[in-house]
Regions:
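Structured alpha-helical
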Residues: 1-212
Length: 212
C-alpha cells in the first residue's frame, strides 16, 4: 500500500524496540516507492466510468494518483499506463483529488514504468487512449470537414469522417474553445481514421479535450 509522507516518522531515541522496528518497516516501504509523473487511464468497472489520472508515486504494493474524476474508498479501479497494460487495485485512502490504490499482489515496478516498446506483432505500444464522443473539425489546406472524435491520447486520436481524406495528409484538429492540434493521418478504414499529433499534448490540454 502507498504510504503518504505524513505517515513516515523519524525514529525517536526514547522509543521502545517495537516502535523502532515499526519505523524501520515504514522506511523500507518508503524507499521502495518511486516518484513519477505519468498519465494513466482510470476506470471504475462498477459504474462503467473512466477518466484521466496522474500517477505520482509507485511501489510494488500500490500507487498514489491525482484522479481527475471522483472515486470512493473501497472502490475497485483499473489503471492503464499503456493502452494494453492494466493494473487493478482498491482505493484505500483519499485526500481531495489524491487517492491511494493498493494492489492485491505486488507488481514489478521497473516493468510497468518501462518506456513503450514494440509488441511481438511489431506494433508500437501506445499511451492510454480515452473514449470520447465529440464533434470536431479537420482543417486541410483547401477545406474544412466535420468529424466525430472517438478517442484521444497524448499522441493521437481516432475519428469518424466522411470527407475525402488520405493517409499522410496533414490536418488541423479543431474544437470550439480548444487549442488546435496539427496532426498527420496515419491510417484509414472506411469512414474511420487515425491521426498522430505533431506534439505531445500536455496533461492539462488532454484534460480539456476530455471535458469538451
Amino acid at each position: 500500500m502507498i504510504l503518504r509522507s505524513e505517515h513516515i516518522r523519524e525514529p525517536d531515541g526514547d522509543s521502545g524496540a517495537a516502535m523502532n522496528q515499526g519505523d524501520e518497516t515504514d522506511r523500507r516501504q518508503h524507499t521502495r516507492n518511486m516518484r513519477v509523473m505519468r498519465v494513466a487511464r482510470l476506470a471504475a468497472p462498477d459504474i462503467h466510468a473512466e477518466g484521466l489520472g496522474m500517477v505520482r508515486d509507485v511501489s510494488p504494493g500500490g500507487m498514489m494518483i491525482d484522479a481527475h474524476f471522483d472515486l470512493e474508498l473501497g472502490q475497485t479501479v483499473s489503471i492503464a499506463l499503456l493502452d494494453d497494460q492494466e493494473l487493478t487495485g482498491t482505493v484505500v485512502w483519499k485526500d481531495g483529488s489524491m487517492i491511494g490504490v493498493s494492489f492485491a499482489e505486488e507488481v514489478p515496478v521497473d516493468q510497468i514504468l518501462a518506456k513503450p516498446s514494440a509488441q511481438p506483432d511489431g506494433k508500437r505500444a501506445r499511451l492510454p487512449r480515452f473514449a470520447v464522443q465529440r464533434p470536431v473539425q479537420l482543417k486541410l489546406e483547401t477545406a474544412v470537414v466535420d468529424a466525430i472524435l472517438h478517442d484521444v491520447s497524448q499522441r493521437g486520436a481516432k475519428l469518424q469522417c466522411e470527407g475525402k481524406l488520405r493517409v499522410h495528409n496533414n490536418v488541423l484538429l479543431r474544437a470550439e474553445g480548444q487549442r488546435a492540434v496539427a496532426a498527420t493521418i496515419k491510417w484509414r478504414a472506411g469512414d474511420m481514421l487515425g491521426v498522430e499529433f505533431h506534439r505531445l499534448l500536455p496533461v492539462s490540454e488532454l484534460d480539456q479535450w476530455l471535458k469538451l
